[in-house]
Amino acid sequence: MSTLKNTFFITPPDTPTQAGPENIFYDFNDGARVLLPEGKWHVRLLDADSENILFCCDVDKGWVTSSKKYFVRFRIQVFRQGEETPLLDETLKLKDRPVLISFPTGTLGDLLGWFPYAERFQSLHKCRLECTMSQDIIDLLAPQYPQIQFSTPDKPRTVAPYATYRVGLYFGGDTNNQPVDFRKVGFHRSAGYILGVDPREAPVRLDLSAPRVIQEPYVCIATQSTCQAKYWNNGTGWSEVIAHLKSLGYRVMCIDRDAHYGQGFVWNHIPWGAEDFTGKLPLQERVNLLRHASFFIGLPSGLSWLAWATRIPVVLISGFSLPNSEFYTPWRVFNSHGCYGCWDDTSLNFDHHDFLWCPRHKNTDRQFECTRLITGAQVNGVINKLHRSLTEQGVEATLKKGVSNE
């Protein structure tokens, strides 16, 4: 296996891994790839499902590769020029084949959103699947998915994969690495389209067996994110929410990794009144705490995805992304009375290097109004509905008596 080309994806092997006749090599590790020796060849790349010819050419020697890198049931045909019967005729067949899905090593939310599609892919094709990702997420997921091999990108175990797929966020209108722009379908569902499986969302499986430790009703919150546009930028919002939660009888625990986060002159701090449960802890410890929370309140960030996977209600506050950009929750908080949805606007490209990115209103009094216009009263209204629902189910009354809801 070749080394990392960048910090995101594993590059394909230098030579295709499958040997055909006449010293022809091919594989599906960067779309369909064929490496031809000296000769007079005619090559066709087809979509085996539609039987459309995607590309054909005459070539004397060298490479023929598809422009499409996502899952297509490719058919590769290699003819000697002038002959009607192909010397090589190979249709993609993944059953029992070594297959690699390369994920970026990046953020928690991306991986938790994407990974269920990898499991769906393995179940569909019955391939020998390896997935590469960061070690902390491997530690969280691997015990729940014994049929899949996990590794970090610098130490892949599959040395000669038959096929490789790279799941990530592709900007700039890229439709070679994804069949549809992720901003049109929601970033997590894009993985389903890249892998050619059912794009309906599903939470990852987690170990939810930890016993309840805190007997009082409590709510977990996460207020930090990776850029200012993702924050809840209402100045008094969190303090209003925390005060309201306490009036309802909840302890409020902030579980961000960082109590303080920002760049340059803009920094965000743990909200006053929340109990400080911040810190760089193993993800399983976060799961153990979330599992027994009455509910979670957060942003379009990784901890919201983690909370969703623990099967507790999630109040998700966002204006930076559209309501269908993340998993469905009936407790989503969104305000349509100002600017919103820049993340999902295909005419814009997110600038990962600009912490204060606000493409339509930066340096104006409308900057970050997508969440600034979401008031504490609006969020508290959603909390009231959720609290009433839990009370009607008898959940909160049981907890107030100090009895576990297990």
Swiss-Prot record:
Effect of residue 358 to R: Loss of glycosyltransferase activity
Reaction catalysis annotation: ADP-D-glycero-beta-D-manno-heptose + L-seryl-[protein] = O-(D-glycero-alpha-D-manno-heptosyl)-L-seryl-[protein] + ADP + H(+)
Binding site residues for ADP-D-glycero-beta-D-manno-heptose: 107-109, 224, 226, 230, 257, 281, 302, 326
Class of the enzyme per the UniProt entry, highest EC level: transferase
One annotated GO molecular function: metal ion binding
Cofactor detail note: Binds 1 Fe(3+) cation per subunit.
Listed InterPro entries: Aah/TibC-like, Glyco_trans_9, TibC/BAHTCr-like_N
Gene3D superfamilies membership: Glycogen Phosphorylase B
Chain residues that bind Fe(3+): 339, 342, 358, 370
Family matches, as SUPFAM superfamilies: UDP-Glycosyltransferase/glycogen phosphorylase (SSF53756)
Cofactor: Fe(3+)
Enzyme Commission number, as recorded: 2.4.99.-
Record-annotated active site: 110
Pfam family, one: TibC_1st
Effect of residue 339 to S: Loss of catalytic activity. Loss of iron binding. Does not form homododecamer
Keywords recorded for this protein, A-Z: Glycosyltransferase, Iron, Metal-binding, Transferase
Family membership noted in the UniProt record: Belongs to the glycosyltransferase 9 family.
Function: Glycosylates adhesin TibA. Specifically adds anomer D-glycero-beta-D-manno-heptose. Cannot use ADP-L-glycero-beta-D-manno-heptose as a sugar donor.
Other remarks in the entry: Able to functionally replace the autotransporter adhesin heptosyltransferase (AAH) of the AIDA system in fully restoring activity to the AIDA-I adhesin depending on the modification of AIDA-I with heptose residues.
Subunit and partners: Homododecamer composed of 6 homodimers forming a ring.
Protein name, as recorded: Autotransporter heptosyltransferase TibC
Species of the source: Escherichia coli O78:H11 (strain H10407 / ETEC)
Lineage: Bacteria, Pseudomonadati, Pseudomonadota, Gammaproteobacteria, Enterobacterales
